[in-house]
Amino acid sequence: SLMQFKTLIMKIAGRSGIWYYGSYGCYCGGGGQGRPQDASDRCCFVHDCCYGKVTGCNPKMDVYTYTEENGAIVCGGDDPCKKQICECDKDAAICFRDNIDTYDNKYWFFPAKNCQEESEPC
């Protein structure tokens, strides 16, 4: 679920998902179009693509199971669809963490009119 995604971003990247990524670049937040503006925006693009491949459940609403083992998030549970959602969220949170150094405030509330380039395929 999106609430769990927010929690994983805090656990893994150490920052607020809503504050930092709720409206960033062309892909972080609702919707997405054009080309990702930087590495953090690309994390959101890849996350959107990941959600797009999930079938049989609702990535934004369905609650999944995970545990923390030696500081790492381990996705679990019996439902392969929900496990896939968890993996999408975990990978995006790791991507955010790994790209904190290049995060740029100029992409906060980035105008959609600047996201008109042709999108690349997932």
Curated annotation (Swiss-Prot):
GO MF annotation list: calcium ion binding; calcium-dependent phospholipase A2 activity; phospholipid binding
Superkingdom per UniProt: Eukaryota
EC number: 3.1.1.4
Record CDD domains: PLA2c
Disulphide bonds in the chain: 26-115, 28-44, 43-95, 49-122, 50-88, 57-81, 75-86
Top EC class of this enzyme: hydrolase
Record SUPFAM superfamilies: Phospholipase A2, PLA2
Catalytic residue positions: 47, 89
A GO-annotated cellular component: extracellular region
GO biological process: arachidonate secretion; lipid catabolic process; negative regulation of T cell proliferation; phospholipid metabolic process
Alphabetically ordered keywords of this record: Calcium, Disulfide bond, Hydrolase, Lipid degradation, Lipid metabolism, Metal-binding, Secreted
Cell compartments where the protein resides: Secreted
Reactions mediated catalytically: a 1,2-diacyl-sn-glycero-3-phosphocholine + H2O = a 1-acyl-sn-glycero-3-phosphocholine + a fatty acid + H(+)
Pfam families documented for this protein: Phospholip_A2_1
Cofactor: Ca(2+)
InterPro entries the record matches: PLipase_A2, PLipase_A2_Asp_AS, PLipase_A2_dom, PLipase_A2_dom_sf, PLipase_A2_His_AS
Tissue expression from the record: Expressed by the venom gland.
Binding site for Ca(2+): 27, 29, 31, 48
Cofactor detail note: Binds 1 Ca(2+) ion.
PANTHER family found in the cross-reference section: PHOSPHOLIPASE A2 FAMILY MEMBER, PHOSPHOLIPASE A2, MEMBRANE ASSOCIATED
Function: PLA2 catalyzes the calcium-dependent hydrolysis of the 2-acyl groups in 3-sn-phosphoglycerides.
Family designation: Belongs to the phospholipase A2 family. Group II subfamily. D49 sub-subfamily.
This protein's name: Acidic phospholipase A2 A'
Organism (species): Gloydius halys (Chinese water mocassin)
